[in-house]
């Protein structure tokens, strides 16, 4: 009952006070738009913030796609209240930081060459082309500062139907960045999505590519997955559970998860405790996993 009330409150708040009407955000978009005619859109929100806005979820990070390059962005905000940080110049990304916001701005781009881990990119001003290089349709929904949706990959419909799917050919998307295998699992669990056999086959046939990904990126993605409120949904999908265990064979004690699921609503179990539950046994399983993924000492103390 409480969850329904909370969701209703968020929905009312979204309709009456949408996040994009915030004065600071409007200033950012007005600044980016300066020098361009009204028929050219200089910037749009994209990714998680748009997805969460449409689902009435709490927005905890904001990504902005723009036709401006990083030098142009820095020039426009050099005398503003925002501090500009070079967080990913090589990939066209800077971060604007103020007292209230941390905004990641990335120039529209397309991949020229990929190796399964990193991509060489070319900067563009074509919104549809930019959408085609993204991972999932639900992450390629754009929103302008006036609340108008641009949805070239039909992500809104997929989001409504809890359908997490790759843009275009699953094999191609995965081979651009093998971390997308784990990301697909995370989003599919989060939205309780049933994926088609073509996608499942693509995940399985490309598992070896995960070896190309840094251990830190893999572990960070795992912790995001374990922090999901509905991580237990993985128990409903044998295909996803089996793929998860192929990637993380040390997290093998799923029988414990099945028992926990029965009382989960009465417990508050964080991702570190959950990691421990799936790992710890009478062997050196935990120690091996910690070594394998270079787990920092502060996290080791929590497990």
Regions found by a protein language model. Give the residues of each.
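Catalytic cores of the polymerase beta-like nucleotidyltransferase superfamily
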Residues: 1-303
């Amino acid at each position: 009952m409480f969850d329904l009330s909370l969701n209703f409150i968020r929905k009312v708040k979204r309709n009456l006070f949408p996040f994009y009407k915030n004065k600071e955000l409007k200033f950012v978009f007005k600044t980016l738009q300066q020098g361009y005619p009204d028929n050219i859109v200089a910037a749009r929100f994209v990714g998680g913030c748009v997805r969460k806005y449409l689902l009435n979820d709490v927005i905890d990070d904001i990504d902005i796609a723009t036709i401006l390059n990083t030098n142009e962005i820095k020039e426009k905000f050099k005398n503003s209240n925002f501090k500009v940080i070079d967080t990913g110049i090589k990939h066209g990304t800077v971060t604007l930081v103020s007292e209230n916001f941390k905004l990641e701005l990335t120039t529209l781009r397309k991949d020229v060459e990929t190796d399964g881990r990193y991509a060489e990119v070319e900067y563009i001003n074509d919104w549809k082309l930019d959408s085609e290089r993204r991972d999932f349709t639900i992450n390629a929904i754009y929103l302008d500062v006036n609340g108008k949706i641009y949805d070239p990959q039909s992500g809104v419909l997929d989001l409504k139907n809890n359908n997490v799917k790759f843009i275009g050919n699953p094999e191609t998307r995965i081979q651009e960045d093998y971390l997308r295998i784990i990301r697909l699992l995370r989003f599919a669990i989060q939205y309780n999505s049933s994926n088609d056999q073509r996608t499942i086959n693509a995940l399985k046939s490309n598992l070896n590519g995960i070896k190309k990904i840094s251990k830190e990126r893999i572990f960070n993605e795992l912790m995001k997955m374990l922090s999901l409120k509905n991580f237990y949904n993985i128990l409903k999908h044998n295909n996803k559970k089996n793929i998860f265990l192929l990637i993380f064979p040390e997290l093998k004690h799923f029988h414990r998860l099945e028992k926990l699921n029965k009382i989960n609503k009465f417990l508050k179990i964080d991702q570190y405790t959950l990691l421990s539950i799936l790992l710890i046994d009478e062997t050196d399983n935990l120690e091996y996993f910690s070594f394998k993924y270079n787990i920092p000492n502060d996290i080791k103390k929590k497990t």
